[in-house]
Every structure is written in C-alpha cells, then in structure tokens.
Regions:
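Intrinsically disordered, glycine/charged-rich C-terminal tails and inter-domain linkers
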Residues: 159-161
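Two-component histidine phosphotransfer core
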Residues: 1-135
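Hydrophobic core positions in the C-terminal catalytic ATP-binding module
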Residues: 75, 143, 149-157
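A short beta-strand-to-loop motif within the catalytic HATPase_c
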Residues: 128, 135-147
Length: 161
C-alpha cells in the first residue's frame, strides 16, 4: 500500500500504474492500449520518486482524451533518468485538450478537475520541502493537417534518497 508513503521505489509506482491501466482497460473493453518505456539507467528498487503523481494524468488521458475518439486509443508512459531526476512523459492520441473542453457538458464544466489540481498542490509542497523545482508541462499535439493528435504531459520528478 503506497497511499501512506511520500516516496516509493519506481518499480512500485510502475506496478501501481500498470494495475490501474489494466483495470481501466477492462472497464472500457480494451478501447485503448498502453506502452511503458523505462530507461535502463533507472534502478527500479533503489530510485524513489514521489508517490501517486503520475496516475491522475493517466486518468485524464483516458477520460478526457481517448474516450472521445473512435478506434483504439494509445497511451505511452516513458520514464527517463537525468542526473538526480526522472522525467515522466505521458502521451495519448486522444481528442486533445481544446476539443475536450469544447465537448464538456455544463455539469462537467462546473466540476473542477481535482486530480490534477491536487497534483499541483502536492508539487508545490514537495518543492518547498525538498528545495527543488518539480513541474508539469502540457503539450498539445497536432497532425500535419492541423487536427489534434493528442496530448503530452511532461512531469519532472526528483529521485528521493
């Protein structure tokens, strides 16, 4: 159970994310596939990262991106090591942030997305605690014809010892 821990081994976080994605895949009758790319430099049992910061972005990719497309959705989760941090890139081929906002109902618009706002609050707390700058960057992806090709989220996480 990682819910009470501030930091977990990368391997534990990957296991939790994989379980979450498998459950959502079953729930949505395999409407999406996912791929995990792990930098071989990451020691999955020795490198610790803040717990539960990646999952809300996977949830957004599924619910607000992929569920809006016809055909099979794709999610890629890539973890890369750079000195004392791990960069996590979550990329989907969904409808994109602009279209997702357009198709929201008035009820959905009134409801704030708590998952990502909680992550941002946690990042601010962790930044103050560790004296570092963790950040999240959103990139809208487009096909050559200008149509949306999905969303990329880049999360910089410290390796915590």
């Amino acid at each position: 159970n990682n819910s009470q821990k501030q930091a977990v081994p990368v391997g534990d976080e990957i296991a939790a994310l994989t379980l979450y994605l498998e459950l959502e895949s079953l729930r949505f009758q395999q409407r999406f596939e996912y791929h995990l790319i792990l930098d071989p430099e990451i020691e999955t049992t020795a490198c610790y990262i803040p717990a539960f910061l990646i999952q809300p972005f996977l949830e957004n990719a599924i619910w607000h991106g992929i569920m809006g497309i016809t055909g099979i959705g794709r999610i890629t989760i890539e973890l890369k090591k750079h000195k004392n941090q791990i960069t996590c890139i979550v990329e989907d081929n969904g409808i994109g942030r602009i279209k997702s906002e357009e198709v929201k109902t008035s009820v959905q618009k009134a409801k704030q997305s708590y998952g990502t706002s909680l992550v941002e609050s946690r990042l601010n707390l962790l930044n103050n605690l560790y004296g570092i700058e963790m950040k999240v960057q959103f990139v809208d992806l487009y096909h050559k014809d200008g149509n949306s090709a999905g969303t990329r989220v880049i999360i910089n996480l410290p390796i915590i010892s």
